[in-house]
């Protein structure tokens, strides 16, 4: 009987060890959390959100910062309403915190200079980038806008952006629709940007 109990105890211990090993990869695979559709700025029609995809969106991933966010260790979710309002969140985990700081700087410079660059690339287009301040959350989040008008086809578009960081994790959020800056929900977007960083971990 003692031998049987010893054997059962050994088997149970081995099973617990295997369970611990099996749990380890799950813990290591923890990923940053994304915004939900309801956490985007309020719109006249409900927001919907895609599932979270691996990598970055097509065509370089981010308006005003194409190919700036590496596809490796990145994931994204897209948002849309029944009208023309849309958005995206791209989150990447950098190798080191120093790399994350560099990425934030790169994205901020790209957003700040986006209007001038678009005007150079598209003669006749009027584009203005503006900075809307820093949000106090984790290591910070910074908000920008891009207001564009194309007289040739008579349309105007407004986009809001945020770049936030929590340790090695950087998250980029964009909101956009037809219209001008006066039509944009800047205050509500700041809340969205803060939530995006708070939800990461």
Per-segment meaning from a language model:
Residues 176-201:
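Surface-exposed amphipathic alpha-helical segments
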Residues 86-88, 153-160:
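Short, surface-exposed coil-to-beta transition loops
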Residues 87-92, 168-177:
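Short, well-ordered beta-strand elements
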Residues 76-108:
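A short acidic-to-branched-hydrophobic micro-motif
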Residues 75-80, 158-165:
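Short, surface-exposed beta-strand/loop micro-motifs that present aromatic residues
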Residues 46-60, 109-156, 199:
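Short Gly/Thr-rich strand-loop-strand
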């Amino acid at each position: 009987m003692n031998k049987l109990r010893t054997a059962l105890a050994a088997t149970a211990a081995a099973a617990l060890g295997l369970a611990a090993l099996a749990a380890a990869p799950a813990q290591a695979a923890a990923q940053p959390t994304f915004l939900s559709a309801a956490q985007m700025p309020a719109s006249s029609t409900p927001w919907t959100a895609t599932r979270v995809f691996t990598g970055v969106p097509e065509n370089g991933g981010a308006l005003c910062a194409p190919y700036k966010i590496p596809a490796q260790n990145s994931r994204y979710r897209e948002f849309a309403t029944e009208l023309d309002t849309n958005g995206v969140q791209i989150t990447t985990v950098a190798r080191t915190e120093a790399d994350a700081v560099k990425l934030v700087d790169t994205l901020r410079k790209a957003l700040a200079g986006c209007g001038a660059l678009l005007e150079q690339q598209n003669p006749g287009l009027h584009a203005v980038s503006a900075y809307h301040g820093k949000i106090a959350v984790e290591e910070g989040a910074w908000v920008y806008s891009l207001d564009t008008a194309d007289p040739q086809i008579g349309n105007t578009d407004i986009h809001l952006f945020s770049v936030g960081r929590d340790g090695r994790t950087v998250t980029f959020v964009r909101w956009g629709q037809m219209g001008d800056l006066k039509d944009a929900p800047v205050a509500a977007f700041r809340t969205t940007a803060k939530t995006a960083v708070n939800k990461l971990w």
